[in-house]
């Protein structure tokens, strides 16, 4: 893991009659990752960069393909959440058109894979993750749940065994609910295949809000930030904050939003390298909006 840079999300918006309103921009921050060659490992040691193996990112015995797939799903889920939060805050029309429950991680070899879409559990259609939990909780340890899934556009059934973990009945998967919305105005944000993960949630929410309202919250400033976003607007902790601050400084960002949980390390990085930028800690989306409206 090494210093990264910024991604101008303002330029990624796809929307009819889109008005940027400003010469400034809203940017996500990223960290750089390099394959572990002798040269890159030597550079990491000289620069005191963090070195991690794929095993440190694995849940159970996942493949690299599953890790990458999970990060892509998390990115798309983050956009789902950002859209709901931004439209709700802006008072714009948004209704849920379709839901799907997607496996993003597995802790056991239970027949399910990252990316599987859960169509039903024991012949019962499940609206969300809570419905799946209810079916599991109504069974006993060592019972099985029959999942009908969609994998690679093909339907199939898998049987997953129930076991106890911290006194809770589980089948060893993490599932998120993805949404397809009816929204007005319609908007989308385009990503590159290499861009993944949930840490851009706050900045996606700000970008969508700026696009669908008449307000100009950017005001010709180059603004960056990081942090996950939850449906209640909470901004969550991320990894690699020092490298994101280094990347922001390299790209001449003047305002950086960070989650409160990452604030202390962000300030330490700023002070260590004497960066000329303002670090703003936020607990939720509204705090970021209020700061930009000052």
Go through each PLM region and give its residues.
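PDZ domains, with a preference for the canonical peptide-binding region formed by the helix
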Residues: 120-148, 263-266, 270-271
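Second-shell loop/turn segments in exported
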Residues: 33, 65-77, 104-105, 120-123, ...
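PDZ/PDZ-like domain segments forming the peptide/carboxylate-binding groove
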Residues: 77, 81-129, 234-239, 260
């Amino acid at each position: 893991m090494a210093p990264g840079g910024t991604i101008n999300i303002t330029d990624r918006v796809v929307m009819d009659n889109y008005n940027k309103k400003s010469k400034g921009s809203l940017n996500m921050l990223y960290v750089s990752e390099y394959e572990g060659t002798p040269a890159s490992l030597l550079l990491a040691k000289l620069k005191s960069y963090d070195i991690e193996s794929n095993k440190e990112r694995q849940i159970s015995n996942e493949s690299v393909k599953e890790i990458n797939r999970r990060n892509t799903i998390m990115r798309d889920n983050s956009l789902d959440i950002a859209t709901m939060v931004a439209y709700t805050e802006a008072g714009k029309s948004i209704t849920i058109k379709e839901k799907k429950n997607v496996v993003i991680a597995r802790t056991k070899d239970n027949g399910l894979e990252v990316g599987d879409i859960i169509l039903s559990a024991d012949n019962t259609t499940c609206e969300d993750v809570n419905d799946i939990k209810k079916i599991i909780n109504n069974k006993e340890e060592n019972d099985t749940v029959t999942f009908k899934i969609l994998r690679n556009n093909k339907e199939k059934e898998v049987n997953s065994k129930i076991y106890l973990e911290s006194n809770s009945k589980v089948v060893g998967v993490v599932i998120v609910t993805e949404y397809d919305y009816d929204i007005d105005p319609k908007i989308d944000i385009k990503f590159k295949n290499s861009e993944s993960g949930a840490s851009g949630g706050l900045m996606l929410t700000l970008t969508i809000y700026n696009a669908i309202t008449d307000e100009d919250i950017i005001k010709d400033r180059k603004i960056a930030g990081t942090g996950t976003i939850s449906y209640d607007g909470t901004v969550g902790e991320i990894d690699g904050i020092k490298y994101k601050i280094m990347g922001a400084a390299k790209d001449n960002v003047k305002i950086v939003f960070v989650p409160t949980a990452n604030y202390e390390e962000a300030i330490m990085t700023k002070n260590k390298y004497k960066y000329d930028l303002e670090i703003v800690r936020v607990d939720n989306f509204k705090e970021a909006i209020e700061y930009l409206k000052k």
